[in-house]
Amino acid sequence: MAEAPPRRLGLGPPPGDAPRAELVALTAVQSEQGEAGGGGSPRRLGLLGSPLPPGAPLPGPGSGSGSACGQRSSAAHKRYRRLQNWVYNVLERPRGWAFVYHVFIFLLVFSCLVLSVLSTIQEHQELANECLLILEFVMIVVFGLEYIVRVWSAGCCCRYRGWQGRFRFARKPFCVIDFIVFVASVAVIAAGTQGNIFATSALRSMRFLQILRMVRMDRRGGTWKLLGSVVYAHSKELITAWYIGFLVLIFASFLVYLAEKDANSDFSSYADSLWWGTITLTTIGYGDKTPHTWLGRVLAAGFALLGISFFALPAGILGSGFALKVQEQHRQKHFEKRRMPAANLIQAAWRLYSTDMSRAYLTATWYYYDSILPSFRELALLFEHVQRARNGGLRPLEVRRAPVPDGAPSRYPPVATCHRPGSTSFCPGESSRMGIKDRIRMGSSQRRTGPSKQHLAPPTMPTSPSSEQVGEATSPTKVQKSWSFNDRTRFRASLRLKPRTSAEDAPSEEVAEEKSYQCELTVDDIMPAVKTVIRSIRILKFLVAKRKFKETLRPYDVKDVIEQYSAGHLDMLGRIKSLQTRVDQIVGRGPGDRKAREKGDKGPSDAEVVDEISMMGRVVKVEKQVQSIEHKLDLLLGFYSRCLRSGTSASLGAVQVPLFDPDITSDYHSPVDHEDISVSAQTLSISRSVSTNMD
């Protein structure tokens, strides 16, 4: 029977009808027994889960003709590239112990420079020339080998591979300087060894080309880049200072030339005056030219005081620019350290967001964990190992067959017996060797039969489209490769052992034979637990990433701490000012009132306080209204009590309603005035008298 295609162990939601891009997850691996007894070769899958063609070569040693030679050549090529990359990093990007070699080269170059200087002194000329000749030989050998190795190691970069790439690398400025110094050294050595005095004297000046060797010490040009960036960043300030200083120099030199040209021969030309102005304004002061007239001295003093300030400005601008640039580089390095924690925090936050149960449409994180979780086959083997550990290293079948003395309590819990191969129940020893699909099928059939002992007859089991016949499923040599987590309404697997029971409560062998190997944990029970565990893992990883990111936000120097405290202090002052404004608005004291209090003026009267829109004015107004209402209620209650005591209608008309104090009710005006109350009282007395006469 044709083998069904492997199914995906999906942790995410089941795929819908619409096609979507998915990662192929794990499939249940075949057991060693299945590989030994199976007739056909297992299906081989690629990295993305697609089946490989039958004729594809097998990976590993001996997978084809010439594979050993190919592997040796590949390993040699890897070692070659690794060595080339290592040499390039040592020469071009030194770190750690690689600086030892560059320090050695610097000492050689500096020694050669010192000997070149000593060779110009008559007393040390002979000794310096002999030492310099030996050192030049060493320098030629070292620099020649280094130049060749540099050109060779540049092949690790893509742009410098091949002959054209090597030529492009040789045209770099520092490589050109190395080549010029090497040729000059060879020429000097050749002229010195031939003994040609004329050639030696002519090429002696070429020794000072070795000064260029000091330039090559900074191979990456970091100092020049730093200087260029500082000059470019402060170009406007430098141009302004240089322009004003140049104007001061021209005017000072011209005026001093006009004042000194007749009386002083040192200022016979404008060029001599410019030389004097340059030496004076730059605060060098050689003293070779000085003004003699008082007019020239006054002009020189005035322009010196004015011009020196502008000539000294570029030094301060460059110094502050260098300091700011270095601080910016340190800050940039500190910010670069935050890049990885920030990326990890964003990734952890997104994965935590995507693992929320309410967002079932986000499946990428579930597929990721689906690909790294162990297969159900490994999980079944793990449960078998746990069971054997509980049974003292024996399989469940061996535990059942072990002889037990009569009357002695059983040491191990009884297990189910093995049935015939055609039945749907299996002994635990064989069920541990089965694939997860067979175990799921077995558990589902046992739940269907129930306690009515229907397991003795082979029942008809509903099978999935990818399932096989029962006879084939019972064979341990035919193991399914995978099973889907998403078939939740289908077959359930037994994945956990029952707890141990005591000897008294243990069922007999007949009952054990009737009861099959059932379990309490199913795929439906596993999936929520697995997702909950993954969700908790994502929460922990998010909290860890958040803590690490907060650690990188800490200030790294004292200046940052001061800036942080100053910013916090300003924020606190702003909050206090806002709070004070709100308190003044509630109390009813505005900015003008506060200024008046500070000056010692008298505060506003009570009437002004009542008329204010502030909270205090509103409270005073409400209190006045409440007092007015209480006074009116007292008057009405007194009037009513007097009417009840008199008991006659005549007394009701005779009683005069007291008038209300207008001062008390200044803030509240009743809809009924006192005149209306008196009129209503008279009307009430007339109506009562009429009613008594009618009676």
From Swiss-Prot:
Q: What is the effect of changing residue 268 to G?
A: No effect on inhibition by potassium channel toxin SsTX
Keyword match Transport: yes
Q: Where is this region: Disordered?
A: 1-21, 400-480, 496-515, 587-606
- Which stretches does UniProt call biased (Basic and acidic residues)? 591-605
- List the residue ranges of the region (Interaction with CALM): 342-351, 535-549
The intramembrane ranges come out as: 271-292
Mutating residue 216 to G has which effect? No effect on inhibition by potassium channel toxin SsTX
- Membrane topology type, per the record? Multi-pass membrane protein
Question: A Pfam family in this protein?
Answer: KCNQ_channel
The cross-references to PANTHER family, in alphabetical order and at most eight, read: POTASSIUM VOLTAGE-GATED CHANNEL SUBFAMILY KQT MEMBER 4 (PTHR47735:SF7)
**Oligomeric form and interacting partners:** Homotetramer. Interacts (via C-terminus) with calmodulin; forms a heterooctameric structure (with 4:4 KCNQ1:CALM stoichiometry); the interaction is calcium-independent, constitutive, participates in the proper assembly of a functional channel. The interaction with calcium-free CALM controls channel trafficking whereas interaction with calcium-bound CALM regulates channel gating. May form a functional heteromultimeric channel with KCNQ3. Interacts with HSP90AB1; promotes cell surface expression of KCNQ4.
Kindly provide the name given to this protein in its UniProt entry: Potassium voltage-gated channel subfamily KQT member 4
Q: What is the lineage of its organism?
A: Eukaryota, Metazoa, Chordata, Craniata, Vertebrata
Gene designation:
KCNQ4
